[in-house]
Amino acid sequence: MKVKKISAANVEACSLPKLFDEEKIDFQPIQCVNWAEYPYKPKVSFRIAHTQNSILLHFKVKEESVRAKYGEDNGSVWTDSCVEFFSIPAGDGIYYNIECNCIGTILVGAGPVRNNREHAPKEVTALVQRWSSLGNQPFAERIGETDWEVALIIPVSYTHLRAHETSLHL
């Protein structure tokens, strides 16, 4: 997949859907479910682009129900309705994952394997701009088909979690 580089100064996360439309960046469907013990497969698609300094993501989700229990970063957002982005920006085997629930609360982790990952401090998570179509306040499970979207602007400096500079290679 080719990831488009765009020139967008001072773009806000809430403007990403419109910007991606203007730049004609298509949605890509997510077709796999990685956990046999969790076979539920909501309809999910995403768009991605980058600037010189940021990764831009826009997710669209359709689910049978939706929940946003966690409102503080680095909480258990994976138990909420959420999406996830993985990258290995420095090519050093350290991968970063950013999990984002349906209200824009994130968990940022880094490490070579799934377990014992280092979580980003609040100073790093605060750098990630977010927008959610469902707002940003936690809520209990809402039963019934729900469409939601989140947009993230992730500065390349989020890899400072590991205290090193990197360049974006997409």
Enumerate the language-model features and the residues they cover.
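Order/disorder boundary and secretion-linked terminal/linker segments
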Residues: M1-K69
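Localized edge beta-strand/strand-to-loop motifs within extracellular or lumenal beta-rich domains
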Residues: W148-Y158
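Extracellular/luminal beta-rich ligand-recognition
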Residues: E72-P138
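Beta-strand-connecting loop/turn residues
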Residues: N53-I55, I103, T146
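Beta-strand-rich interaction surfaces with strong enrichment in secreted/lumenal proteins
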Residues: S45-F46, N136-R142
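Conserved small/polar residues in nucleotide/adenosyl-binding loops
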Residues: T159-T166
